[in-house]
């Protein structure tokens, strides 16, 4: 299945990033430790805060979430656009049972995801983002804090949800991710959600990831899965 022109052009950019990362001097890059292929240690259907509690919602957030939970029980749920292969957005792509690849370049950092080959490029130039229209992947900008990659993303469309249970967000949500190596060669990502319209205060959750042996990021084409009678998103037990 061929990708859209946008996806094709973005792939070429990611190829360029990969070629730069493959340069003989790339192995000595101080931040190369976060590069490579990663897979989540778990695949939560519902996000909780770091202390294991439900995210603190406003009245509007509670209303939207209850509507999504009710819709999930219907014959044809509409709250989750990924069911018809539309982009699930971030941070949800990082909670799904698919590997993803991080490609590190001095000027940009690329993320390539296994589900329907979604990808994003993080601007490392230090310039602030200037969102034109809300997008599933938003407009990410990043910087290094020691070995940690810090990404701030805004311009995220409210058409996406934060997790499979239907946690909502608004177009004004700000997502901050702190990505850093931890013990045993793992990667930890700490997510901070700031969205006053939906959540009563900023809240954080975190995930850990490992290098899956012998696993590559391949294009799991969503429409092909549906044509075979399979769910749009693979079940976790089928991906471990």
Regions found by a protein language model. Name each.
Residues 2-3, 25-240:
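Hydrophobic small-molecule pocket/channel-lining residues, especially in calycin-type beta-barrels
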Residues 2-13:
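Bacterial N-terminal signal peptides that target proteins for export
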Residues 7, 20-26:
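Short intrinsically disordered, low-complexity segments
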Residues 11-21:
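Bacterial N-terminal signal peptides
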């Amino acid at each position: 299945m061929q990708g859209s022109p946008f996806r094709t052009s973005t792939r070429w950019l990611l190829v360029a990033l990969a070629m730069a990362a493959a340069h003989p001097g790339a192995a000595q890059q101080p931040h190369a430790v976060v590069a490579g292929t990663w897979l989540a240690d778990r695949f939560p259907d519902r996000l909780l805060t770091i202390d294991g509690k439900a995210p603190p919602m406003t009245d509007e957030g509670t209303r939207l979430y209850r509507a999504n939970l009710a819709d999930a029980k219907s014959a044809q749920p509409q709250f989750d656009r990924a069911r018809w292969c539309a982009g699930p957005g971030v941070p949800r792509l990082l909670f799904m049972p698919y590997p993803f690849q991080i490609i590190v370049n001095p000027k940009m950092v690329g993320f390539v995801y296994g589900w329907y080959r979604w990808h994003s490029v993080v601007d490392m130039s230090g310039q602030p983002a200037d969102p034109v229209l809300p997008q599933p992947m938003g407009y990410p900008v990043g910087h290094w804090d020691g070995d940690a990659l810090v990404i701030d993303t805004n311009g995220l469309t409210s058409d996406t949800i934060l997790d499979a249970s239907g946690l909502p967000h608004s177009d004004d949500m700000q997502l901050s991710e702190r990505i850093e190596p931890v013990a045993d060669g793992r990667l930890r990502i700490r997510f901070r959600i700031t969205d006053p319209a939906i959540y009563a205060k900023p809240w954080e959750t975190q995930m850990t990831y490992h290098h899956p042996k012998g696993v590559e990021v391949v294009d799991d084409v969503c429409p092909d899965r549906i044509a075979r009678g399979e769910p749009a998103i693979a079940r976790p037990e089928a991906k471990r």
